[in-house]
């Protein structure tokens, strides 16, 4: 599957305007040809395209092709009409034309108007060798909960082992002063009763200093903590904090053109507003659940919001999102591709996108 990586645009006026100034490994998918509504001339303008194989130039000595190679290029060259636009009646024409890296393409406009082409640079998904970054598509909520649960269990086990070790060390400290007291008691049998009475008191004071909190009390407190489990004071506090940070139930709204958005997760970063460049992750589906396009790894899909670089449903549905936010956008056919049929999308299709806003520039 091909993935869009950048917006393509070209203004054509006159003859033999190259599709790209330099060779590129990416294909070009043309989706629209249009003219400015402010064109003064009312004459129609026809867009022609000339296609021929690209000949790699490996050496400066090869820059001038010999006559035989030139004849071969002319024989294999194809030229055809893409569309005809006329100010006042026809301002734009949807296209579905892919230019591969192996083709050398030139556009010509036979008329007074300037024709503007737009589309996307594409790369094959299997050709992407970039490792997945931190900005790759997030885990689903259930997977995140599972990771947090496992982490929490490991921390609890470490805490339990730490407290058990602490209790063992205190038991050893308890036994040491007890033995010392017994030895001292044997040595002081013949001393006066006053000295015998003072000796235990001194030993008890020393024992309390060494012990700090009695071991029994610590063990009881630790047992109570285990018995309390998730209903203990600390757990209640954590639960309250988690519930306060947890997102509320998804909010669904209907926007311009019948576009329906559901905020699955509210972001906390910069807001997406018209004129700003946004970087997105997305999965595009038909109403039957069939995936026709996606961008879940590698370089995020980027475009300028509100400039018409994407279908109108995206300009409407993405507006207002914040960095880190996730949203489900349901786009009716008139706000998508209408009665136009493109690969993977039948005409008059309602499209469903699950999107995440990665960054706002």
From Swiss-Prot:
Residues 241-252 have a biased composition (Polar residues). It is found in: Nucleus; Nucleus, Nucleolus. InterPro entries: NPL (IPR041232), PPIase_dom_sf (IPR046357), PPIase_FKBP_dom (IPR001179), PPIase_Fpr3/Fpr4-like (IPR023566). Residues 123-174 have a biased composition (Acidic residues). Its main location: nucleus. GO terms for cellular component: chromatin; nucleolar chromatin; nucleolus; preribosome. Pfam families: FKBP_C (PF00254), NPL (PF17800). SUPFAM superfamilies: FKBP-like. GO terms for molecular function: molecular condensate scaffold activity; nucleosome binding; peptidyl-prolyl cis-trans isomerase activity; rDNA binding; RNA binding. It catalyses: [protein]-peptidylproline (omega=180) = [protein]-peptidylproline (omega=0). The modification Phosphoserine is found at residues 192, 249. The modification Phosphothreonine is found at residue 213. Residues 122-256 are annotated as: Disordered. GO terms for biological process: CENP-A containing chromatin assembly; ribosomal large subunit biogenesis; ribosomal small subunit biogenesis. Belongs to the FKBP-type PPIase family. FKBP3/4 subfamily. PPIase that acts as a histone chaperone. Histone proline isomerase that increases the rate of cis-trans isomerization at prolines on the histone H3 N-terminal tail. Proline isomerization influences H3 methylation thereby regulating gene expression. This is FK506-binding protein 39 kDa.
């Amino acid at each position: 599957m091909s993935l869009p990586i950048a917006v393509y645009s070209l203004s054509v006026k006159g003859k033999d305007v190259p599709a790209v100034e330099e060779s590129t490994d990416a294909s070009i998918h043309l989706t629209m040809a249009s003219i400015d509504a402010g064109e003064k001339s009312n004459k129609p303008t026809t867009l022609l395209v000339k296609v021929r194989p690209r000949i790699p130039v490996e050496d400066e000595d090869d820059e001038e092709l010999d006559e035989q190679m030139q004849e071969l290029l002319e024989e294999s060259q194809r030229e055809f009409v893409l569309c005809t636009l006329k100010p006042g009646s026809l301002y734009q024409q949807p296209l579905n034309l892919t230019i591969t890296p192996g083709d050398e393409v030139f556009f010509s406009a036979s008329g007074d108007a300037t024709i503007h082409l737009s589309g996307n640079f594409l790369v094959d998904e299997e050709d992407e060798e970039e490792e997945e970054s931190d900005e790759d598509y997030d885990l689903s909520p259930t997977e995140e909960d599972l990771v947090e649960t496992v982490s929490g269990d490991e921390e609890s086990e470490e805490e339990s082992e730490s407290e058990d070790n602490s209790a063992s060390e205190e038991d050893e400290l308890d036994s040491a002063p007890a033995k010392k007291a017994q030895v001292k008691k044997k040595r002081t049998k013949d001393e006066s009763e006053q000295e015998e009475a003072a000796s235990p008191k001194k030993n008890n004071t020393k024992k309390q200093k060494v012990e700090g909190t009695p071991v029994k009390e610590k063990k009881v407190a630790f047992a109570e903590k285990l018995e309390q489990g998730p209903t203990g004071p600390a757990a209640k506090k954590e639960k309250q904090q988690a519930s306060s940070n947890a997102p509320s139930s998804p909010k669904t709204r209907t926007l311009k053109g019948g576009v329906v958005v559901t905020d699955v997760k509210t972001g906390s970063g910069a807001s997406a507003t018209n004129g700003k460049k946004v970087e997105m992750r997305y999965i595009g589906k038909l109403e039957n659940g069939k995936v026709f396009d996606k961008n879940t790894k590698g370089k995020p899909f980027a475009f300028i919001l509100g400039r018409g670089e994407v279908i109108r449903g995206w300009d409407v549905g993405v507006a207002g999102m914040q960095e880190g936010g996730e949203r489900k956008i349901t786009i009716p056919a008139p706000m998508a591709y209408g009665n136009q049929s493109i690969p993977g999308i039948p005409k008059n299709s309602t499209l469903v996108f699950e999107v995440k806003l990665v960054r706002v520039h």
